[in-house]
Amino acid sequence: MKYAVIGDPVSHSLSPVMHQVNFKSLNMEDTYEALHIPTQDFHDIRHIIEDNHINGFNVTIPHKERIIPYLDEINDQAKAVGAVNTVKIINNKWIGYNTDGIGYVMGLKQVYPDLENAYVLILGAGGASKGIANELSKIVQPKLTIANRTMSRFETWDMDINAISLEQSEQYLDEFDIIINTTSAGLNNNDDIVISLDNLSSSTLVSDIIYIPYKTKFLKEAEFKGNTVYNGLDMFINQGAESFKIWTGKQPNILEMKYAVLNKLKGV
């Protein structure tokens, strides 16, 4: 079987490294590659996938919403989020899934076991935020708080949440047990920081879904203040592991997948 990740750009993706190591550790002859599909060519996606003999694929930026009209079916999680990151192909039928939210929450449970009673603030209101919020809402009892720069973004949300501005979130930081940044601030070593952490409580877990760099400026600042921090590496590994399960019905070797990505990040 042949799998791929599609995006624009996509050459930076660590998904091929992660999945190839997993296939090898399980003695599978399947392959996984990065397939660059420019936005202007996306209308031909069905033919491109068929011509490359792809049996299933992951979808990354900027195609997670764009793929939806080309699918034959979409599962409830992806429908709720309005974005797809995994496509399974059965007898030429394309089925869309979203494993980002569950991937993040699986990892978060390991570092914050009392998730059920946590007061959670999510920064950003894009697809990643919605996926994580949708999954957290199944576990967390207190109402989730989502902060975004523009309030109009919440018009597409169909969830029972507290919607506030980023400025408001800075005032109430000390009320939260977990703060999760889902914005692109800090990506690729830029020095942007989404909010001021001046009012941060020392007991708050501070998280960022970015894993390149391993610690964003946001996490470094929180760590400097003495807080526990948690990046997006587990989310990346777990969403890939969930995709593998969807495609093959088999259990992935998550430890090998994580080592492969860590070694690549370290330049080993």
Swiss-Prot record:
This protein's record includes keyword NADP: yes
Keywords: Amino-acid biosynthesis, Aromatic amino acid biosynthesis, NADP, Oxidoreductase
Protein name as it appears in the record: Shikimate dehydrogenase (NADP(+))
Keyword Amino-acid biosynthesis: yes
Residues at which shikimate binds: S13, L14, S15, T60, N85, D100, Y211
GO (cellular component) term, any one: cytosol
Source lineage: Bacteria, Bacillati, Bacillota, Bacilli, Bacillales
Function comment: Involved in the biosynthesis of the chorismate, which leads to the biosynthesis of aromatic amino acids. Catalyzes the reversible NADPH linked reduction of 3-dehydroshikimate (DHSA) to yield shikimate (SA).
Residues noted as binding NADP(+) in the record, renumbered to the chain: D76, G124, A125, G126, G127, A128, N148, R149, T150, M151, S152, R153, I209, G232
